[in-house]
Design a protein with these regions (language model features):
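Surface-exposed, low-hydrophobicity beta-strand/loop segments enriched in small/polar/acidic residues
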Residues: 18-172
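N-terminal soluble segments of membrane proteins
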Residues: 2-3, 17
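Sec-dependent N-terminal signal peptides
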Residues: 4-13
Length: 172
């Protein structure tokens, strides 16, 4: 039995180095604080770490309806009919490659990020990008219709860290 346990410990270290990208916070009207300017805003925060050897981030699904922590009644949200308003990208202590790409797509493959987060991720400073296909006075924002898939690509730094804040607004 000791040999089996020892073999498992020796042969599985690569599994510990797998990249992660998880919902780490949801700010909605149920836990309103200084992050939420009004009742029609939901902020979903993803904390992502690249693989320790392959420097890749896993794609992550943001459910259309959910809560944080998952399965609780806390911080409940329903993004149906909301628009993706802004995306904040903050590099962590282990900085990613400059000009990394973030994509946000729905179940039908529509790019809710409108290509605005392509090859322009900063490795050193936080960025807040408005997601609109036109300018004032008539900006057009992509509407959330299904669960979202978030992917980070074009990174070549092992264990790079990125925090994403997806800001959704209710359509008025």
């Amino acid at each position: 039995m000791k040999k089996l346990i020892l073999a498992l410990l020796i042969l599985t270290p690569t599994a510990w180095a797998v990249g992660t990208c998880n919902v780490s916070n949801v700010t909605s009207t149920q836990n309103a604080n200084n992050r939420v300017p009004d009742a029609g805003v939901v902020i979903v925060t993803l904390t992502c770490t690249a693989d320790a050897s392959a420097h890749t981030f896993p794609a992550t699904t943001v459910p259309l309806v959910g809560s944080y922590p998952s399965g609780t009644l806390l911080n409940a949200y329903n993004l149906t009919g909301y628009v993706l308003y802004q995306v904040g990208r903050t590099p962590g202590t282990t900085q990613p490659t400059a000009n990394y790409t973030t994509t946000i797509t729905d179940a039908q493959g529509f790019a809710l990020d409108l290509g605005l987060l392509t090859t322009n991720g900063s490795a050193t400073s936080a960025q807040l990008t408005g997601i609109s296909s036109a300018t004032a006075p008539y900006p057009v924002y992509p509407t959330v219709r299904s669960a979202l898939t978030v992917a980070i690509t074009a990174n070549s730094v092992n264990s790079a860290q990125i925090t994403l804040d997806l800001v959704f607004r209710a359509v008025v």
